Design a protein with these regions (language model features):
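A positively charged, amphipathic N-terminal helix/segment that binds anionic biomolecules
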Residues: 1-122
Length: 122
């Protein structure tokens, strides 16, 4: 029976990374270890409630505002209502997800260049 060992050593040391890569990795760790992450799209709607006596039924009056987060899950579009109390936190979590995705894109490009044989451009 042949035994294989899995090395948990990093592919390269921190000192071998460019300053840009160290900064990107550091920010990614901050985002992952800090507050929440939420993947989806922020949607704000204006709608009437349907009551004839409500201000939203009057022409020219402001309608009711509601906020939702949409995302694809298992091939289906799902929506989640966001209350007024949750809006600031939810927006921040969506922003964290977007920032993390941008960081990953930049790291993927650095590593793509490394595999390609050239050193990554900073």
């Amino acid at each position: 029976m042949r035994r294989y060992s899995l090395s948990m050593k990093p592919d390269f040391t921190r000192s071998a990374m460019s300053p840009r890569e160290r900064k990107l990795r550091s920010r990614a760790v901050q985002l992952l270890s800090g507050a929440g992450l939420l993947h989806g799209s922020w949607i704000e709607r204006q709608r009437g409630c349907g009551r004839k006596t409500c201000h939203c039924a009057q022409p020219g009056d402001p309608r009711h505002h509601s906020t939702y987060v949409y995302r694809q899950h298992e091939g289906k579009l799902r929506q989640l209502y966001v209350s007024k109390v949750q809006r600031e936190t939810t927006r921040r979590w969506l922003d964290h997800d977007s920032e993390l995705h941008e960081i990953l894109q930049a790291l993927w490009e650095i590593h793509w260049q490394r595999v390609r044989g050239g050193e990554a451009k900073d």
